[in-house]
């Protein structure tokens, strides 16, 4: 199994189509299996229909997403987890440090 690349939402457009990604985002909207996540001024649309039966989504909730980027820029979600209580500054620092090592 291929590992997911840990990124920020604003880096999704720079990733290859089909690439497996992992990122954190705040729920801006959710309707009919389509999720809009934001982080600062960046946003991404995610299709959660594959995991839909197992998903409970609340507006403004922070979510940890693993999915594949489609050609149209939407991310097909493979795994979704709540990130309630996450220390955002520490998380951002950890992602930046990890990216420097990759």
Curated annotation (Swiss-Prot):
One example of a Gene Ontology biological process annotation: telomere capping
Keyword Ribosomal protein: no
Annotated localization: Nucleus; Chromosome, Telomere
Gene3D superfamilies for the chain: Nucleic acid-binding proteins
Keywords: Chromosome, Nucleus, Telomere
One Pfam family it belongs to: Ten1
GO molecular function, one term: single-stranded telomeric DNA binding
Domain of life: Eukaryota
Leader sequence segment: none
One of the record's GO cellular component terms: chromosome, telomeric repeat region
Transmembrane segments: none
Broad class of where this protein is predominantly found: nucleus
Its job: Required for telomere maintenance.
Assembly behavior: Interacts with stn1.
Protein name: Protein ten1
């Amino acid at each position: 199994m291929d590992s997911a690349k840990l990124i920020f939402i604003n880096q999704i457009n720079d990733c290859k189509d089909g690439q497996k990604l992992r990122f954190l985002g705040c729920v801006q909207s959710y309707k009919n299996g389509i999720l809009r996540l934001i982080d600062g001024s960046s946003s991404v649309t995610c299709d959660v229909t594959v995991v839909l039966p197992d998903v409970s989504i609340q507006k403004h909730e922070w979510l940890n997403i693993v999915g594949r980027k489609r050609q149209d820029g939407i991310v097909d979600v493979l795994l979704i987890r709540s990130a309630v209580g996450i220390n955002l500054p520490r998380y951002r620092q950890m992602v930046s440090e990890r990216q420097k090592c990759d």
